[in-house]
Curated annotation (Swiss-Prot):
Its EC number is 4.2.1.33. It catalyses: (2R,3S)-3-isopropylmalate = (2S)-2-isopropylmalate. Catalyzes the isomerization between 2-isopropylmalate and 3-isopropylmalate, via the formation of 2-isopropylmaleate. InterPro entries: 3-IsopropMal_deHydase_lsu, Acnase/IPM_dHydase_lsu_aba_1/3, Acoase/IPM_deHydtase_lsu_aba, Aconitase_4Fe-4S_BS, Aconitase_4Fe-4S_dom, IPM_dehydratase_rel_enz, IPMI_cat. The keyword Metal-binding applies. This is 3-isopropylmalate dehydratase large subunit. One of its GO terms (biological process) is L-leucine biosynthetic process. Belongs to the aconitase/IPM isomerase family. LeuC type 1 subfamily. Its cofactor is [4Fe-4S] cluster. Binds 1 [4Fe-4S] cluster per subunit. It comes from Dinoroseobacter shibae (strain DSM 16493 / NCIMB 14021 / DFL 12). One of its GO terms (molecular function) is 3-isopropylmalate dehydratase activity. It holds the Pfam family Aconitase.
Length: 467
């Protein structure tokens, strides 16, 4: 048999039909749903008199619009648009009989944290959601990517998706990471090296010693931002860490089913002589703690660097850099470590897990914030409960952080947690576009530890100076 990549193997296992022009019909194992991209899809089912084809494989949770303050069940805390969307999801979940974690459920949280946490995400699966950061689930060796609302309706109705196959791209991170360097630094560094279009047309498989050394939560951070690198999806082959994470979770296989699943999962790796259409190799020891300076995730530099000048770029990037610097209010030649910060946000589907909170709390222990406001938003109610049990919440609160309820929060300006005009934020989220966190808000993407360092110094700071 021809040597295949991990992507090839998962694709082949789910291929229901292939047309002469390469258009394929794929079977979908898990469909994750949230309140923003699903209302029109469910309404389309109603109008056509259709049911959800596989309600047992469809999981819904409100996350984008929900407030993160106490008493958030009160509809007055939401804008009318947000309230309508959350109430629509409540009704649609009930009417169509799908799995649902409402705001009142401790298991509620960001859909890409809830899925793995509850054992819905398993190796070798196809996973889709009407959300671009669905690639997160690729950390389990699952083929996971975002879809549009019309596709959400198609999957709800048929449990299949029409697709054309992407090309194979390998991103290898060799060697060991240095102290203070994290999964977030890996994924930002890859995007900085390849650009936001570097993965366009590809599915990325991340591999190498530095990737293998990561925990499952670190791997989720890496895969989460595959989309910012332009890729359709990001994958990491499953291994013992994967199996250990999955085993015993509420919806993971058990008994004989576990053994059968495990046998298949152990075949999910890229063959040694598989063909790659593109290969990128980065030495792990060359990666430093990084920060974004502009308005694209590819605007990445080590914290030790200086704000670049437009003249440092070529072609169309000269004008783009000039616009970014103007929007961000930065002067070329300024050391990144001298940029003052107003706000710190720790959370999101990129960095809202328990290990992220532990890393931030380790830096904050015994210190006070030097910024105007700082908030920690756990990725799920269960993460929040665990952080409280471990004493992390007390560390955050004593440092001066707001300790919030679970949700997407300040990652995107679709709920009450937003930046004001000109407000500068060190954020553990995934996008630094103009207006992403609020009208004319300024975003610097960093790891949780780097965000904590900025909180206590009041400026972008090399976390290694505080370790």
């Amino acid at each position: 048999m021809t040597a295949r990549t991990l992507y090839d193997k998962i694709w082949d296992a789910h291929l229901a039909h292939e047309a002469e022009d390469g258009t394929c019909l794929l079977y979908i194992d898990r469909h994750l749903v949230h309140e923003v991209t699903s209302p029109q899809a469910f309404e389309g089912l109603r109008m056509a008199g259709r049911t959800v084809r596989a309600p047992d494989k469809t999981i819904a949770v409100p996350d984008h619009n929900v407030p993160t303050t106490l008493g958030r069940e009160n509809p007055d805390q939401m804008t009318e648009d947000s309230r309508i969307q959350v109430e629509a999801l409540d009704k649609n979940a009930k009417d169509f009989g799908i799995h649902y974690y409402p705001v009142s459920d401790i298991r509620q949280g960001i859909v890409h944290i809830v899925g793995p946490e509850q054992g819905w995400t398993l190796p070798g699966m196809t996973v889709v959601c009407g959300d671009s950061h669905t690639a997160t689930h690729g950390a389990f060796g699952a083929l996971a990517h975002g879809i549009g609302t019309s596709e959400v309706e198609h999957v709800l109705a048929t449990q299949t998706l029409i697709q054309k196959k992407s090309k194979n791209m390998k991103v290898e991170i060799t060697g060991k990471l240095r102290p203070g360097v994290t999964a977030k630094d890996i994924t930002l560094s890859v995007i900085g090296a390849t650009g936001t279009a570097g993965g366009t047309g590809y599915v990325i498989e991340y591999c190498g010693e530095a990737i293998r050394d990561l925990s499952m939560e670190g791997r989720m951070t890496v895969c989460n931002m595959a989309i910012e690198g332009g890729a359709r999806a990001g994958l990491i082959a499953p291994d013992e860490k994967t199996y250990e994470y999955v085993q015993g979770r509420p919806h993971a296989p058990k008994g004989a089913q576990w053994e059968a699943a495990l046998a298949w999962w152990k075949t999910l790796y890229s063959d040694d002589d598989a063909h790659w259409d593109k290969v990128v190799t980065i030495k792990g020891e060359d990666i430093a703690p990084v920060v974004t300076w502009g308005t694209s995730p590819e605007d990445v530099l080590p914290i030790s660097a200086m704000v670049p000048a437009p003249e440092d770029f070529t072609g169309g990037k000269v004008d783009a850099a000039r616009r970014s610097l103007d929007y961000m209010g930065l002067t070329p030649g300024t050391p990144l470590s001298e940029i003052e910060i107003d706000t710190v946000f720790i959370g999101s589907c990129t960095n809202g897990r328990i290990e992220d909170l532990r890393a931030a709390a380790e830096i904050l222990k015994g210190k006070k914030i030097a910024v105007k406001r700082a908030m920690v938003v756990p990725g799920s109610g269960l993460v929040r409960a665990q952080a409280e049990e471990e004493g992390l919440a007390d560390i955050f609160k004593q440092a001066g952080f707001e300790w919030r309820m679970a949700g997407c929060s300040m990652c995107l300006a679709m709920n009450p947690d937003q930046l004001s005009e000109g407000e500068r934020c060190a954020s553990t989220s995934n996008r630094n576009f103009e207006g992403r966190q609020g009208y004319k808000g300024r975003t610097h993407l960093v790891s949780p530890a780097m965000a904590a360092a900025a909180a206590v110094t009041g400026k972008l700071t090399d976390v290694r100076d505080l370790m």
